[in-house]
Amino acid sequence: MPHSVLARLPPGSVRLVAAFGLLLLVSLLVLHRRPGRPHVAAAAASDRLTDPSRSRLFLSQSPGANASIAADLRALTAGPHLAGTPASAGAAAHVLARLRAAGLQTLTREYEPLLSYPGHASLALLRPDGSLLARLSLEEPADEGRRVVPPYHAYAPSGGAVAEAVFVNLGREEDYVVLERLGVGVRGRVAVARRGGGYRGGVVARAADKGAVAVLIAGNADGGVERGVVLLGGPGDPLTPGWAATSGAERLKFDDKAVKQRFPSIPSMPVSAKTAAAIIRSLGGPAIPAEWKDGLGVDTGGLGPGPTLVNFTYQEDRKFYKIRDIFGIIKGQEEPDRYVILGNHRDAWTYGAVDPNSGTAALLDIARRLGIMLQSGWKPRRSIILCSWDGEEFGMIGSTEWVEDNLEDLHSKAVAYLNVDCAVQGVGFFAGSTPQLDKLLVDITRQVRDPDVTGKMVHDTWNEMSGGIKIERLARTDSDFAPFLHHAGIPSVDLYYGEEFPGYHTALDTYNWMEKHGDPFFLRHLAITEIWGLLALRLANDPVLPFDYQAYTSQLQEHIKTLSALTSNGHAVNLMNGCVNDLSGAAMEVLKEMKKLQQMDLYDEHARMRRRLLNDRLLLAERSFLQPEGLQGRGWFKHLLYSPPEDYESKLSFFPGIADAISRSANLSDKEQEVAMQHEVWKVCRAIQRAASVLRGEFSEQKPTNFSSLVTP
């Protein structure tokens, strides 16, 4: 692989890259790639195994692989390995050694971001006169050996409070509406919330907006206390937004407006269910609504405020630490400058058996299998990069810094990013993807045996469990696909077994739990490994990329239907339907072109050039959905279809700019809301039209479409 994939490159225009890339490709192919034996030989080497043969060879290595996966997971989870600690460096060494043992070329990239660790913390209940009533534990009952980092919220500011407490349920807007109706306010008080109200940083931010002076978030009643990050405004190092946090890089000051917006304004802390219950039992005020008691384990107490006081102090320790991303690389034989990227993070809040090292063990088994295939003489058509990220638990830092470090290279060369974080956390297969990868994903699950039902394939049980195949869209920011999709516009997939895990981010996330409860025979690990690896093989080897933009248009049409139910702005809906129809036409044309090329001689030079150009259009179309300046007020997020909305409680999980406009204008008249939405609607429409033009391989100005009639009252 060219070293440039890991080189630092200056940021630039997405559209300029796309146009320049296409022109450069045409020039290189026409001027330099004349028919000749070397090119035929390279193509023959990469295509020596047909797709069924490649799949069979990959799957033939499954017997006994579950034992290998289990051994890697046991080694990785022998102790806690939080990013920035010596133990984390040990986990990195294990991954590096296993990639090298598989015969892959390896690279390591270091970054030096700002990380946050806990210092001193204390919590006590006081009587109304200020005398001590009880000291409350901030430790985790499940952590008997006291080996893991104490529960804390990364990047929560140092501070303290002596104030009355209020129970705010999940800390959502609707919960504060209930409190207001009951005459309970949180201004100047400590908000006590229970887990389940969405992103913890959003829960803290909403409490601060309501005037709270501190927030305590209760864990589940099983003894675990959920650690986590509370930064706002997107992933990555908070002091280097948009560029890599390399040693000696420019760093913004803490008083910079962009930095201050990312850090919470009040201290917060995760606490055990037992500690939260002790506080709630001491509260008076209105009775707790019955539906708010779920999982609390309290039968007395009220919503507050008071009469007892909470005395809470917290001291944060912020430092710059080195983190290490590790890469295993297989250089493509025919198209080495096209990258199929598989990623999983390596760092963990505690032992990490589920999050993330179930995925790490699967990644290492893929490396082992690909190494055996290389020894057999196989080489992929395109390059395959296996990525082991560091610093994910602090806000996807390792992956984000690498994407920012290599943005131009990725814009022009990345085919897709395939993510696995918590590979196995329970029963049932779940997946998210950008829509053009849906069909490929579904097809792959027809090739993999279901780990829980004998005689069935994953596709069968997935379909039965969900009442039809359901694929999530990746607008959330809780794993490493976020920088690839939301910032770089790279088609992405996320895979996992099990919807929820009670030990998430707690000391319960151990190898022992996995062996006893999560996946005793490691067969779900095996299924994820096979799906993940087969996806990579198809994307790295199919002569024509298996992208289906008809599925994208169908999904956009569904999104528009959902939007139309939330707004009375019929003009906006009509406008968007017109743009999607244009994309649908382009997708149909591409589908016909794909079928023609699939019938042509694989080694014909003219056909090879046409395939290359078509593939470039297919991979660049997703970049068309990027807005170079980003979303309003949130410039790091650039994807106009699938970035997270500003309001984490928004009813829209797509069209984030439109979702933000709706949220910001919620208290305005219908006419004012329409005006607020209109500009964001046009942005989305222009992006969809750009994608249609890219798919057709033409300048957008060549076929201007008149949509004025659609928006004329």
Swiss-Prot record:
<keyword id="KW-0472">Membrane</keyword>
<dbReference type="GO" id="GO:0009640">
    <property type="term" value="P:photomorphogenesis"/>
</dbReference>
<keyword id="KW-0482">Metalloprotease</keyword>
<dbReference type="GO" id="GO:0009908">
    <property type="term" value="P:flower development"/>
</dbReference>
<feature type="binding site">
    <location>
        <position position="393"/>
    </location>
    <ligand>
        <name>Zn(2+) 2</name>
    </ligand>
</feature>
<feature type="transmembrane region" description="Helical; Signal-anchor for type II membrane protein">
    <location>
        <begin position="11"/>
        <end position="31"/>
    </location>
</feature>
<dbReference type="InterPro" id="IPR046450">
    <property type="entry name" value="PA_dom_sf"/>
</dbReference>
<feature type="topological domain" description="Extracellular">
    <location>
        <begin position="32"/>
        <end position="713"/>
    </location>
</feature>
<dbReference type="InterPro" id="IPR039373">
    <property type="entry name" value="Peptidase_M28B"/>
</dbReference>
<feature type="glycosylation site" description="N-linked (GlcNAc...) asparagine">
    <location>
        <position position="706"/>
    </location>
</feature>
<dbReference type="InterPro" id="IPR007365">
    <property type="entry name" value="TFR-like_dimer_dom"/>
</dbReference>
<dbReference type="GO" id="GO:2000034">
    <property type="term" value="P:regulation of seed maturation"/>
</dbReference>
<dbReference type="GO" id="GO:0010081">
    <property type="term" value="P:regulation of inflorescence meristem growth"/>
</dbReference>
<feature type="topological domain" description="Cytoplasmic">
    <location>
        <begin position="1"/>
        <end position="10"/>
    </location>
</feature>
<dbReference type="GO" id="GO:0004180">
    <property type="term" value="F:carboxypeptidase activity"/>
</dbReference>
<keyword id="KW-0645">Protease</keyword>
<keyword id="KW-0812">Transmembrane</keyword>
<feature type="binding site">
    <location>
        <position position="421"/>
    </location>
    <ligand>
        <name>Zn(2+) 1</name>
    </ligand>
</feature>
<feature type="glycosylation site" description="N-linked (GlcNAc...) asparagine">
    <location>
        <position position="667"/>
    </location>
</feature>
<dbReference type="GO" id="GO:0004181">
    <property type="term" value="F:metallocarboxypeptidase activity"/>
</dbReference>
<dbReference type="GO" id="GO:0010074">
    <property type="term" value="P:maintenance of meristem identity"/>
</dbReference>
<keyword id="KW-0862">Zinc</keyword>
<protein>
    <recommendedName>
        <fullName>Probable glutamate carboxypeptidase VP8</fullName>
        <ecNumber>3.4.17.21</ecNumber>
    </recommendedName>
</protein>
<keyword id="KW-1133">Transmembrane helix</keyword>
<feature type="active site" description="Nucleophile">
    <location>
        <position position="392"/>
    </location>
</feature>
<keyword id="KW-0341">Growth regulation</keyword>
<keyword id="KW-0217">Developmental protein</keyword>
<feature type="binding site">
    <location>
        <position position="345"/>
    </location>
    <ligand>
        <name>Zn(2+) 1</name>
    </ligand>
</feature>
<keyword id="KW-0479">Metal-binding</keyword>
<dbReference type="GO" id="GO:0010305">
    <property type="term" value="P:leaf vascular tissue pattern formation"/>
</dbReference>
<keyword id="KW-0378">Hydrolase</keyword>
<dbReference type="GO" id="GO:0009793">
    <property type="term" value="P:embryo development ending in seed dormancy"/>
</dbReference>
<feature type="region of interest" description="Catalytic">
    <location>
        <begin position="245"/>
        <end position="539"/>
    </location>
</feature>
<dbReference type="Pfam" id="PF04389">
    <property type="entry name" value="Peptidase_M28"/>
</dbReference>
<keyword id="KW-0735">Signal-anchor</keyword>
<feature type="glycosylation site" description="N-linked (GlcNAc...) asparagine">
    <location>
        <position position="66"/>
    </location>
</feature>
<comment type="similarity">
    <text>Belongs to the peptidase M28 family. M28B subfamily.</text>
</comment>
<dbReference type="Pfam" id="PF04253">
    <property type="entry name" value="TFR_dimer"/>
</dbReference>
<dbReference type="GO" id="GO:0005886">
    <property type="term" value="C:plasma membrane"/>
</dbReference>
<comment type="function">
    <text>Involved in the regulation of meristem development and seed maturation processes. Mediates regulation of embryonic regulatory genes and genes controlling abscisic acid (ABA) biosynthesis and turnover in developing seeds. May be required for the synthesis of small signaling molecules that integrates meristem and embryo formation in seeds.</text>
</comment>
<keyword id="KW-1003">Cell membrane</keyword>
<dbReference type="GO" id="GO:0046872">
    <property type="term" value="F:metal ion binding"/>
</dbReference>
